[in-house]
A protein has these predicted regions:
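Glycine-rich beta-strand-turn "strand-cap" elements at beta-sheet edges
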Residues: 40-45, 76-100
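N-terminal first-folded block
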Residues: 2-40
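An amphipathic, aromatic/His-enriched active-site/gating alpha helix that lines ligand/cofactor pockets
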Residues: 20, 24, 28-36, 55-89
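Short alpha-helical
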Residues: 13, 47, 69, 73, ...
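Short, well-ordered beta-strand segments in beta-rich or mixed alpha/beta enzyme
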Residues: 2-8, 39-66
């Protein structure tokens, strides 16, 4: 399995536009083959700070996600609403484990 996160910052005044844009992405992404979890989070402390937190069966599934029409449409529009860089991180895991 692959854990993936992408953190980014909306331009001042653009947080709601980001939320509205992401709303078009969530359900189709969750329905994709290989998607185990797909969450979009907004910081309660810095409202312009957002993160995608995702769990995929494989790197191939994540790569396929990035080629889906709904993702490509989203990716085309998002840069106009954000500032700074995107922090992307991925980790391989063999799945959730119970807490000790």
């Amino acid at each position: 399995m692959l854990v993936f996160s992408a953190t980014f910052t909306a331009k001042p005044g653009a947080a709601q536009a980001v939320i509205d844009l992401v709303a078009t992405l969530i359900e189709p992404s969750r329905a994709e083959p290989g998607c185990i979890r797909y969450d979009f989070l907004q910081s309660p402390y810095t409202p312009n700070q957002f993160v995608f937190f995702e769990l995929w069966k494989s790197q191939a599934d994540l790569d396929a996600h990035f080629q889906e029409p709904h993702f490509l449409a989203f990716a085309e529009r998002l840069p106009a609403l954000t500032e700074g860089s995107f922090e992307k991180v991925a980790y391989e895991t063999d799945g959730p484990k119970p807490a000790a």
